């Protein structure tokens, strides 16, 4: 379980918005140990705290998959699918995030449909709802 926390400091620290790139919302569906997860952020630093197996690294892996490459664990894309204790069949997985940039916000997403997991294990990338090559993530 992930909890939200706030740390008070006597010294206010602000990020210059002309350089800031940050995730304001992230949604995971069928990804690793998450059936559904929706988190919203305000641009402040985030600390993930929880017991072993709570999903901290899985959340970081989800963020890393919104950049070009194979993610921080370099896992096979078919392994990213959440397997339910009730059913071992794949149902697809997705990660989407609203990313704030100096040029304005955009929506980025990646995932696999269930039929793609068994046929051709390649994840799809979408930016603002349009299919894109993986390198398009680096251009934003």
For the regions a language model picked out, list residue spans one by one.
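Nucleotide-state sensing region of NTPase/ATPase domains
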Residues: 67-140
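Pre-Walker A-like glycine/lysine-rich segment at the N-terminus of P-loop NTPase domains
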Residues: 2-7, 14-64
């Amino acid at each position: 379980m992930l909890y939200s926390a706030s740390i008070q400091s006597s010294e206010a620290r602000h990020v210059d918005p002309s350089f800031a790139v940050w995730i304001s919302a992230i949604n995971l569906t069928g990804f690793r140990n998450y059936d559904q997860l929706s988190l919203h952020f305000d641009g402040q630093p985030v600390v993930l705290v929880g017991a072993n197996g709570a999903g901290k690294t899985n959340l970081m892996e989800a963020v890393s998959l919104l950049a070009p490459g194979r993610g921080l664990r370099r896992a096979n894309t078919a392994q990213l699918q959440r397997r339910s204790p009730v059913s071992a069949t794949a149902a697809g997985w997705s990660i989407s995030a609203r990313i704030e940039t100096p040029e304005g916000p955009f929506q980025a997403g990646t995932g696999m449909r269930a039929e793609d997991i068994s046929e051709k294990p390649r994840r799809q990338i979408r930016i603002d709802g349009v299919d894109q090559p993986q390198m398009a993530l680096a251009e934003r």
